[in-house]
Swiss-Prot record:
This is Nuclear pore glycoprotein p62. It comes from the Eukaryota. The modification Phosphoserine is found at S411, S421. It is found in: Nucleus, Nuclear pore complex; Cytoplasm, Cytoskeleton, Spindle pole; Nucleus envelope; Cytoplasm, Cytoskeleton, Microtubule organizing center, Centrosome. Essential component of the nuclear pore complex. The N-terminal is probably involved in nucleocytoplasmic transport. The C-terminal is involved in protein-protein interaction probably via coiled-coil formation, promotes its association with centrosomes and may function in anchorage of p62 to the pore complex. Plays a role in mitotic cell cycle progression by regulating centrosome segregation, centriole maturation and spindle orientation. It might be involved in protein recruitment to the centrosome after nuclear breakdown. GO terms for cellular component: annulate lamellae; centrosome; cytoplasm; Flemming body; mitotic spindle; nuclear envelope; nuclear membrane; nuclear pore. Residues 331-461 are annotated as: Required for centrosome localization.
């Protein structure tokens, strides 16, 4: 049937159905279905399913009904799928997640394919029909979280799922929240895959928890996906948008890619995110392994269903992530030592400069202190001078007052003398006395002038007798003239001595001549 059906049929419907179907073995239908059928119908299902006997999986895209068989539910599902795997756009929530209808717990479901926004425990989205418990290659765009225990292989595509099983070698774009469960399912699909990564996914994510389980790495980018650890997994290459929640205990390999992780972290886990050109190393808590991750993390929250649903028992808390942290290459000891030496030299230079400035400031301080003391002493001296000046002013005032009193006393005496001057006659003795007094005054003035002249002569002689300046040409001429004078005086003295000797010799000769003449006269007589 391929149309709009508002009645109830037992056959697979391929359109919009709002009736209630009876239990019958049907085949998968394609289209939009709003009825409740016992089989995996394709389309929108809003009905309540009856308990069918045995059905086959539907392969349609949108399914909003509640299916009770172990077949897959394809499409939009607004009911609760107890135990079935859908391959459509799933907005329903499986057993442990959000529930829009009240149903009992169901066994493990298969993978949901296509575009899933539900939060199943672990459902691998398959574009086609899948009836077995083993997960097949998912092909689609899934925002749901799937729970399955089937082993999964390398997946490729864009994944927004949240699973608990680990798929080895999944490559694509993962935005789901990945949990942990036993035995990964082999997934191999197209660009949008419900890859449920069980360990540290690509991007710069390296979660670590206290539970020692085997951890793997994934190369790619994880956004919005919570990744949990699985017992055995391998490297997955996806563009994952999930937040890792693995509990890695064994040594893990380096991851490379682009990741945006949720800050919900395990108690002892730490996630380091770096750019694609930087390599960092994070160590796990209570483990002995480290993982070098290279990628870019934007730290977004994982997709957690809102509603009265129970969280999967196998899921662990997500690990915290450090956002946008960029670390460069590690510094070597030689570089560190060179930096320390450089800083030491700079510190010594600054210390010497500081000591020089401190010495100069100390000298200035001493100078200021000395000048302050000098100013203080000068101020004291000025105060003393002010006191002396005040005392001198007082004495001068006293002298002025005394002089004024003396003038007051002399003025009447002078007046009386003037009055009596006309009547007094001077005697001869008084006149002589007056002349003698005037003569004494003249002699005293002359003596004073002579004393002043003598002082001038003495000063002139002292200046002349002092050491003469040899550079003065006048002094040199004076020396030459003095030498000539000395020579002339010596010649004069020598000539005077010779004159005396000549006179003596002439007297002796004269005396002998006279004696000879006397002797001759006596002889002739």
């Amino acid at each position: 049937m391929s149309g709009f059906n508002f009645g109830g049929t037992g056959a697979p419907a391929g359109g919009f159905t709002f009736g209630t179907a009876k239990t019958a073995t049907t085949t998968p239908a394609t289209g939009f279905s709003f009825s409740a059928s016992g089989t995996g119908t394709g389309g929108f299902n809003f009905g309540t399913p009856s308990q069918p006997a045995a059905t086959t999986p539907s392969t349609s895209l949108f399914s909003l009904a509640t299916q009770t068989s172990t077949t897959q539910t394809p499409g939009f599902n607004f009911g609760t799928t107890p135990a079935s795997g859908g391959t459509g756009f799933s907005l329903g929530i499986s057993t442990p997640k959000l529930s829009l209808s009240s149903t009992a717990a169901t066994p493990a479901t298969a993978n949901t394919g296509s575009f899933g926004l539900g939060s199943s425990t672990l459902t691998n989205a398959i574009s086609g029909a899948s009836t077995s418990s083993q997960g097949t290659a998912p092909t689609g765009f899934v925002f749901g979280s799937s729970t399955t225990s089937a082993p999964s292989t390398g997946t490729t595509g864009f994944s927004f799922t949240s699973g608990s099983a680990s798929q080895p070698g999944a490559s694509g774009f993962n935005i789901g929240s990945v949990g942990s469960l036993a035995q990964p399912t082999a997934l191999s699909g197209s660009p949008f895959t419900p890859a449920t990564l069980a360990t540290t996914t690509a991007g710069a994510t390296q979660p670590a928890a206290a539970t020692p389980t085997a951890a793997t790495t994934s190369a790619g980018s994880t956004l919005f996906a919570s990744i949990a650890a699985a017992p055995a997994s391998s490297s997955t290459t996806v563009l994952s948008l999930s937040a890792p929640a693995t509990t890695a205990a064994t040594p893990t390999a380096g991851t490379l890619g682009f990741s945006l992780k949720a800050p919900g972290a395990a108690p002892g886990a730490s996630t380091t995110s770096t750019t694609t050109t930087t390599t960092t190393t994070t160590t796990t808590a209570s483990t002995s392994s480290s993982t070098t991750t290279t990628g870019f993390a934007l730290s977004l929250k994982p997709l957690v269903p809102a509603g009265p649903s129970s969280v999967a028992a196998t899921a662990l808390p997500a690990s915290s992530t450090a956002v946008g942290t960029t670390t460069g290459p590690a510094m070597t000891y030689a570089q560190l030592e060179s930096l320390i030496n450089k800083w030491s030299l700079e510190l010594e230079d600054q210390e010497r400069h500081f000591l020089q400035q401190a010495t100069q400031v100390n000298a200035w301080d001493r100078t200021l202190i000395e000048n302050g003391e000098k100013i203080t002493s000068l101020h004291r001296e000025v105060e003393k001078v002010k006191l002396d000046q005040k005392r001198l002013d007082q004495e001068l005032d006293f002298i002025l007052s005394q002089q004024k009193e003396l003038e007051d006393l002399l003025s009447p005496l002078e007046e009386s003398v003037k009055e009596q001057s006309g009547t007094i006659y001077l005697q001869h003795a008084d006149e002589e006395r007056e002349k003698t007094y005037k003569l004494a005054e003249n002699i005293d003035a002359q003596l004073k002038r002579m004393a002043q002249d003598l002082k001038d002569i003495i000063e002139h002689l002292n200046m002349a007798g002092g050491p003469a300046d040899t550079s003065d040409p006048l002094q040199q001429i004076c020396k030459i003239l003095n030498a000539h004078m000395d020579s002339l005086q010596w010649v004069d003295q020598s000539s005077a001595l010779l004159q005396r000797r000549v006179e003596e010799a002439s007297r002796v000769c004269e005396s002998r001549r006279k004696e000879q003449e006397r002797s001759l006269r006596i002889a002739f007589d």
